[in-house]
Amino acid sequence: MHGDEPASIELVRGFVVKECAHAVALLPVANPDGAKRGTRYNARGIDPNRNFGFNWREDSIEPAGPEAWSEPESRALRDFIAAWRPAKIIALHWALGEIDADGVQSTALAEVMWAAMNEAERRPYRLRVTELGRGQRRLERIDAECPGSLGQWAGYGLVYLDDSQPSMITLELPFDPALPRPDSLGDEHLSVVQQRWQQDPRGYLDGVRPGVEKMLRAAIDFVPSVPL
């Protein structure tokens, strides 16, 4: 989604889907303008991940556009999802080191992804789920943190015609794959990890790829329960 997060793009491009019983769509780049320019924003200076039509806010910290769905990137993803109706959606970002379950229906998928890793691979992440009483960090709602995001729309606002909702995971890659996730990360965390990326991108990818690929394969195999 964000062009200044190249690690997420490279990991998706390098991921090989092995034989499975489910259709899988991989979209390495959802913001072509941002990817080309190495910026979070599209050519109009808007953050596409603040432009989705759920909990959209004009006064978002990041520029959200004049109205929800004003940007071609958010509309393209909306239309793609509406056509495919995926049961599971995983969006990769960089580099808060989190597995965010957007919506109560997403808790089980987040926990399956967490369980797919070994202890060392989990260290740079934290698990965040909406359902109270489960996970490392318990939250009722996270609407205020990322208004108008893909996770907000797909996890809370999107309901298919059969009344089902997709399991929506926002997977934030680690700040440092060799260290436990810090309790807090300052606003400068992305610039720091970008500098490290410029120095040794392969080292970073080699450090995170095993855990990420285990999570993605577990997610592909996971079958969400159907509400009665």
Give the positions of each predicted feature.
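Surface-exposed helix-capping loop/turn segments at secondary-structure junctions
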Residues: 84-87, 123-127, 220-228
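Short glycine/proline- and acidic residue-enriched helix-loop micro-motifs
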Residues: 56-67, 131, 183, 189-199
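Active-site/substrate-binding loop(s) of hydrolase catalytic cores
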Residues: 1-119
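Active-site-adjacent mobile loop/cap segments within catalytic or ligand-binding domains
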Residues: 98-102, 143-228
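A generic signature of intrinsically disordered, low-complexity regions enriched in glycine/proline
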Residues: 37, 51-55, 59, 135, ...
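Active-site-proximal helix/loop segments of hydrolytic enzymes
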Residues: 72, 78, 84, 94-170
